[in-house]
Design a protein with these regions (language model features):
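Structured soluble/peripheral alpha/beta segments that form catalytic or ligand/cofactor-binding pockets
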Residues: 258-589
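N-terminal catalytic or cofactor-binding beta/alpha core of small enzyme domains
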Residues: 1-257
Length: 589
């Protein structure tokens, strides 16, 4: 077949992206997403991020245990996703046949094969998620939907349980199917189960027949960003995996004392979509935003609470366009007026609100790279011991910190309010260590996207310090898809909050990767003379996120010094617009 045949059939003939390693252990490693994004992937509504560093990790892991390996080191998953059966059959059927031959050879030599699929999980906290078609429910592992469990009870309670214990001893939590259970019919892991015994594809039938005899143990290993970037967590993770799978005499381990009960009968109810919370349900993201003008540092942290919550995160905008980021997934732990997820903690201390973090952060030298997440992650490095200690002291007329949170039926629901105040603290990240003093806001996340009905929106908050008048202000404007305009402004002074009208915000950028050229706002009170707020951008980060109906949300988010007459302060700004990707114009519905 020629290149013309490749274009006509869609089957990839070039195999330069594939690296094959021959080993003597009864183990086959596969890294399906080790490539890099092609430029055209940026035009997609929701481009997939390749699993950076998994090619190198798989290569190192194979050397450590003497395993065979099939490594994708260059092919963009947005071109062909080797982890999706339909795309494999359409564009690389030979790759499926190659895996079947490799498994057959291992089984013929050793009597059984262990298949480990090496993937990347784009959460930064050092974590590993084990996919075998199940999720954990207490002491049970239950199939997701109609998934087949891809490993035996003995393998789950032996090598996999030992892997979990070895990782835990190295401060790396391991979970079963928390994020990626690998139970979908199109998932490559399911090719190594008896799910495809009746398939019309010979390679799938062969793999399923081998699995039906109990001769395949298959596992999907999802490594977080901190476990993939060069550094201590990656070294400790590979060390634990080598210890667990390196004994090739039997390829397993004696069971651990506390065993999991594995349910193998598919529960179709788990395949049904989860019920969404009602539209009237309170927003579920609470956090804090702070700006220290003298240090030129901004910080944003938030926690997801209640139904649909997925995690927590903290981002630091540092001088010279640098960014430090930590993210985590899972359920926020709530104890009174204290929220925590891993090393990130947000709590009430007396009348103050405190944020504390000690852990790894990915630091990126150029904030504009965050327009393409894969580009940002590929340029970043791991700071294994970043520290953040911040305290927000609310202004006298603001609500008591405890009022920001209320507990109801075991869930923590954020009250729809906020508290502005003065900031004090210290950070250490990306070689920078400094004390912080400035301004902050806590409460419902200021920049949450919500239902994304807007075509554009401009928002900001600013503080001016105690003794000033006003103490703080908050301005929001947006244009909806029906071209209706909405605006609100409220100002905090010694008597409390007041609503203003006649609101206008000027906040424009030359391009999605450039900071705002002009930042200002005007507002009036009962038709009186206008107040004008002028901002000078200190730092910013551009973001690109998928929106509804083939649109994409482009956001410029950052911190600025603000002046209001003779008063000086600082705060946060955001400009977002929703573009139709087909026309590159503001979306209309």
């Amino acid at each position: 077949m020629s290149s013309d045949d490749e274009a006509r059939t869609g089957v990839i003939l070039d195999r330069s992206w594939l690296e094959e390693i021959d080993g003597r252990a009864p183990i086959l490693l596969v890294a399906p997403h080790g490539g890099r994004a092609e430029p055209k992937a940026r035009r997609l509504v929701n481009p997939k991020v390749n699993d950076l560093h998994t090619a190198e990790i798989t290569r190192e892991f194979a050397r450590g245990i003497g395993a065979s390996a099939l490594i994708n080191s260059a092919l963009d998953r947005n071109r062909v996703d080797l982890n999706r059966m339909s795309q494999l059959l359409a564009h690389a059927p030979w790759f499926l046949e190659l895996m079947a031959r490799r498994v057959r050879a291992i089984v013929e030599r050793h009597g059984r094969a262990v298949v480990l699929l090496i993937h990347g999980w784009n959460v930064i906290a050092p974590r590993l998620d084990v996919g075998i078609g199940v999720r954990r429910h207490g002491g049970e592992l239950r199939p997701v939907g109609s998934a087949r469990v891809s490993a035996s009870d003995e393998f789950i309670n032996g090598p996999l349980a030992h892997l979990g214990r070895r990782l835990a001893a190295r401060d790396i939590p391991a979970t079963f199917g928390l994020r990626y259970p690998a139970g979908g019919a199109q998932n490559l892991l399911q090719a190594f189960t008896d799910r495809h015994l009746e398939s019309g594809v010979s390679a799938l039938r062969e793999l399923s027949a081998i699995a039906a005899r109990g001769a395949i143990e298959a596992v999907q290993l999802e490594l977080s960003v901190a476990l993939r970037m060069p550094g201590g967590p990656r070294e400790r993770c590979i060390e634990a995996m080598v210890e667990c799978f390196g004994d090739t005499r039997r390829g397993d381990s004696p069971p651990v004392p506390a065993q999991l009960r594995i349910i193998r009968t598919p529960d179709i109810r788990s395949a049904l979509p989860a019920k969404r919370p009602p539209a009237a349900a309170p927003a579920g993201r609470v956090g804090i935003e702070c700006f220290a003008p003298d240090a030129r540092v901004g910080a944003m942290a938030s926690f997801d609470l209640g139904a649909g919550g997925v995690g927590a995160r903290i981002m630091l905008l540092l001088p010279e366009g640098r960014v430090a980021l930590f993210t985590n997934e899972g359920r926020t732990r709530l104890v009174g007026a204290r929220a925590s997820l891993g090393p990130l903690v947000f709590e009430v201390r007396g009348r103050r609100l405190a944020l504390r973090f000690r852990g790894p952060m990915v630091t990126v030298p150029d904030a504009t790279s965050y327009l393409v997440l894969e580009r940002a992650l590929s340029s970043g490095r791991l700071d294994e011991s970043a520290e953040v200690e911040l305290e927000l002291d609310p202004y006298p007329k603001e609500a008591e910190p405890q009022a920001l949170f209320r507990e109801h039926a075991g869930q923590w629901d954020p009250v729809p309010t906020s508290a502005f105040g003065t900031l004090a603290g210290e950070i250490r990240a990306d070689g920078l260590r400094c004390a912080l003093g400035g301004f902050g806001r806590a409460g419902l996340s200021f920049t949450g996207l919500g239902p994304m009905r807007f075509t554009s929106r401009r928002m900001l908050w600013a503080c001016f310090g105690e003794g000033a008048s006003p103490l703080a202000l908050e301005i929001r404007t947006h244009i909806d898809a029906d071209a209706s305009e909405h605006a609100s402004a409220r100002v905090l002074n010694s008597a409390g909050w007041s609503a203003f009208d006649g609101v206008r915000v000027e906040l424009e950028t030359r391009s999605v990767s450039a900071p705002p050229e002009h930042l200002s706002a005007t507002f009036t009170e009962n038709g009186a003379s206008a107040h004008t707020l002028i901002g000078e951008v200190e730092n910013f980060v551009p973001l690109s996120r998928p929106g509804p109906a083939n649109t994409r949300i482009f956001t410029s988010l950052g911190f600025a010094r603000f002046t209001l007459g003779s008063r000086e302060g600082g705060g946060l700004f955001e400009y977002s617009r929703r573009d139709d990707l087909a026309t590159q114009a503001p979306a209309r519905t």
